[in-house]
Amino acid sequence: MAKNKVLGRGLADIFPEINEVYEQGLYERANRVVELGIDEVMPNPYQPRKVFSEDSLEELAQSIKEHGLLQPVLVVSENGRYHLIAGERRLRASKLAKMPTIKAIVVDIEQEKMREVALIENIQREDLNPLELARSYKELLESYQMTQEELSKIVKKSRAHVANIMRLLTLSSKVQNALLEEKITSGHAKVLVGLDGEKQELILNSIIGQKLSVRQTEDLARDFKINANFDNKKHGFKQTQTLIAGDELERLNQSLWDHYKLKAALKGNKIVLRCYENSLLEAFMKKMMS
């Protein structure tokens, strides 16, 4: 299959108009900016962004009420209807503010270009969820059959950045959902890459339930990896069964953390405790000797 033309070139015909409007301050020209009924604008079906912060939308809605919409949305006209290309957050906030109309720039663009613009607009947003960014990268790579190197040049990011973001897609669905719902950060998620699904979800439960920092998560993941790589032969014994099941270790960890800020990890046939708060260690020792 022949490779589609590079995405940057495919957008070249419409970017000059957008730049003219946004960068040169000409958006007040009557033939560019129109006032549309808020219900006339249909969401972009190719919008890769699925989750929007409610607090952020509320803040923007309040700003729109007080100052109006400062940056018009981009739309394309088709069969008497307007489809959103860029500005989903502004559209949602305007609806939240119960605005009857919205400022829009009508762009002359082919239907098949809508996905391209929506993806680029979202990729360039700083507040895009890392998982949504990874999915957008994946869609660009697959739709245009480009390499990560080519994509990195288009989005003006390093190839390492693109590769690291894409690795988030290897996480279990449960971890991906937690990242999408902002129950964990991208820092937490990156620590879990490379672990099997069961270990990912065990650590995920600890992150959420015990509010672990990224550093604490790294320590916990390191302990899991040490357990997996532990060579029993070096210690002169053959272990025929797991010393403690994963769910039992999780319950033990939960109890130790709640009472003594301790973490337990398996190392061969041993349970090793890591202390995170020295002041509670003495209480733990007294409990063990009582």
UniProtKB/Swiss-Prot annotation:
GO cellular component terms given for this protein: chromosome
Coiled-coil residue windows: none
GO terms classed as biological process: chromosome segregation; positive regulation of sporulation resulting in formation of a cellular spore
Top-level lineage group: Bacteria
Keyword DNA-binding: yes
PANTHER family: CHROMOSOME-PARTITIONING PROTEIN PARB-RELATED
Role played: Involved in chromosome partition. Localize to both poles of the predivisional cell following completion of DNA replication. Binds to the DNA origin of replication.
Protein's name according to its UniProt entry: Probable chromosome-partitioning protein ParB
Record organism: Helicobacter pylori (strain ATCC 700392 / 26695) (Campylobacter pylori)
